[in-house]
């Protein structure tokens, strides 16, 4: 357990009531795009918004919690030299942020590298657990993969920091419609992909896959950009990162069918209460176990928990609930690991070697990847 200061009063409320905040990002002057939707059926009541009393209750729970006495996951220092020697390895850096070493490449997913996440700089949910590596000590990143534009997955300060790395910015790969935001706020081009698009990065192949979630950074920008997950492939080995998603069995089975065997998955297990609202957006630990089974994953690790307090559950509760669900379903290969621990992507099974994909080719037109949102067909 690590002593952490109590989150300043009002900082969480600013994020949970973000619609009332003054954001530090300009509103795009581009034509308004069409609204995007999930690819899989959702419950009839999934379009409802949480009432104001929910945000007030959540803010009260978080503001009155004694964080200094709260159980938190262990954080270990990340040894980049050790990780660099691994042929294909992953390190969870807290929340959804994940560093991947694949071959000779460094890939970073959903970077949130600083103290707060939220629409107002210096406010919002405060980091409970430290990064295992200071932002200034990161290796030169080859590609940054963004799952969707919610503040805890697309942090403006973090992507600006990465864009200014020595040697030039990494490639930023994002969902359809999000390139305009990067041009206006980060000053770099981002390559847009849609669901099932596949893109080469040297000998690595990257696939943008569906997720059952939503997008939007402002009250006027709901579901205008594509959300999804990523599969990072190296030969016959595959690492799956869903970003945020709710549970739809068909979604995970389709990923298994279309992409092939998943050797390692980083499945979100936190921010799942209260279920009457969170079930439309986030997996709970038991659903994460079901997703692990649906994917046929060789191994899964739990992420998206105990870093920023975004749900009503206690920070360590996801790990306890995951352990119970793993035992209840008699599942193997799914656990939690310390923040910063290097995890090897397991070797593929013989059947997975037979499923090895053809050499990656870009399945999106490079000329279309940087077209501003609103100038492309936003049909689903």
Each language-model region and where it sits:
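Bacterial N-terminal signal peptides that target proteins for export
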Residues: 2-11
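Metallo-beta-lactamase
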Residues: 15, 20-137, 171-243, 263-270, 321-341, 345-348, ...
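Cap/insert and terminal regions of metallo-dependent hydrolase folds
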Residues: 21-46, 127, 143, 171-180, ...
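Active-site metal-binding motif and surrounding structural segment of the metallo-beta-lactamase
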Residues: 51, 121-173, 189, 259-266
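Catalytic core of the metallo-beta-lactamase
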Residues: 97-103, 200-261, 279, 283-286
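Divalent metal-coordination and catalytic microenvironments
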Residues: 100, 110, 148, 206, ...
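Active-site metal-binding loops of divalent metal-dependent hydrolases
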Residues: 111-113, 149, 177, 211-213, ...
């Amino acid at each position: 357990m690590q002593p952490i200061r109590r989150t300043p009063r009002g900082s969480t409320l600013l994020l949970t009531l973000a619609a009332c905040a003054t954001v530090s990002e300009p509103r795009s002057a581009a034509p308004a795009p069409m609204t995007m939707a999930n690819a899989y059926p959702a419950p009839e009541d999934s379009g409802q918004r949480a009432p104001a009393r929910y945000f007030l209750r959540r803010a009260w729970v978080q503001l009155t919690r004694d964080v200094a006495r709260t159980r938190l996951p262990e954080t270990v220092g990340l040894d980049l030299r050790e990780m660099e020697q691994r042929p294909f390895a992953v390190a969870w850096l807290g929340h959804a942020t994940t560093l991947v070493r694949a071959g000779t490449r460094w890939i970073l997913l959903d970077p949130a590298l600083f103290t707060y996440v939220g629409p107002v700089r210096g406010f919002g949910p405060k980091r409970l657990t430290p990064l295992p590596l200071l932002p200034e000590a990161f290796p030169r990143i080859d590609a940054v993969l963004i799952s969707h534009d919610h503040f805890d997955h697309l942090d403006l300060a973090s992507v600006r920091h990465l864009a200014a790395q020595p040697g030039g910015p990494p490639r930023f790969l994002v969902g359809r419609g999000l390139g305009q935001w990067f041009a206006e706020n980060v000053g770099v081009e981002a390559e847009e992909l849609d669901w099932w698009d596949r893109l080469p990065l040297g000998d690595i192949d990257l696939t943008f896959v569906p997720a059952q979630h939503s997008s939007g950074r402002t009250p006027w920008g709901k579901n205008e950009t594509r959300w999804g997950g990523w599969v990072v492939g190296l030969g016959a080995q595959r690492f799956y990162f869903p970003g945020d998603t709710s549970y739809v069995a068909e979604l995970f089975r389709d990923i298994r069918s279309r992409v092939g065997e998943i050797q390692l998955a980083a499945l979100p297990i936190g921010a799942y209460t209260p279920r009457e609202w969170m079930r439309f957006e986030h997996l709970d630990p038991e659903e994460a176990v079901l997703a692990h089974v649906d994917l046929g994953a060789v191994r899964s690790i739990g992420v998206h928990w105990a870093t920023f307090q975004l749900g009503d559950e206690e920070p360590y509760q996801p790990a306890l609930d995951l352990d119970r669900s793993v035992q209840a379903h008699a599942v193997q290969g799914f656990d939690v690991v310390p923040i910063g621990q290097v995890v090897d992507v397991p070797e593929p099974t013989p059947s997975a070697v037979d499923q090895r994909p053809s050499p990656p080719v870009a399945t999106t037109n490079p000329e279309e990847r940087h077209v501003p949102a609103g100038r492309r067909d936003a049909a689903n």
